[in-house]
Amino acid sequence: MNSKKKNIETQIVEDFEKIRPAITRLLQTQMNNDNLSLRYGRSKSNSKNDIVINPSILVNTISKTKLDRDEVMIGTVVHEAIHATKNYSLDSESLRNIFQDELDDVEDIEDVLEILTGPFGKYVFDILIHSIEEKIFVKQYEGLNSILKDIYTESFAEIRKLTNFSQYLALLFHSITTYINPEFQNYKKSVVSALNESLHILKTLNYEAVNVSEVVEATVQMIDICKRYNILPDLEKYNLGEQKE
């Protein structure tokens, strides 16, 4: 890490500690969990009640922004905290009713997704779940909604630099959260076509509460769409990348 980023991280640690108690209380209240804790660290926790914010994410975001640093800090921490939690439960019986012959004795959501969608379904599932959770969470706070709208507007152009599948996921997020109205015409035809089909599926989802079975079913449909338009990552390169990590 260069000296500029080291200095930024030192300041970020101080700023994070100032807002941590208030953000923790906000998360505890909205997620109805007094045991939630929020801290700064580089390693994920195995506890669902322990939310860890990676400093590199804050450094990268804050070092690039032209917006108010305190607001960007608050918005980024809330966004990352929502996406780090698993604030939902799996209704195995409901899923088995939908996918009758495929989920015998399967209880874990990651196993369910692997069976039904292969290695990439988890990314679509996560973006759908967390986009809905963020939409539910943020709509109650006009100031927070405004902060996040500014952050996403500033960074929106960066989406074009991503791979096709990552572009698809990012644009799904924006289509659900509606902080901004994403324009699709600047993307490859395959990505735009996959998104346009997926938007019809988004219209069927519940945005007042997370329905896991509904999201799993949507994920299966969206992965099929991604396959048809050939925007999923190359599986061989994906596995090689995992091994390197």
Give the ranges of each region predicted by the language model.
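Short, functionally important secondary-structure microenvironments
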Residues: 1-245
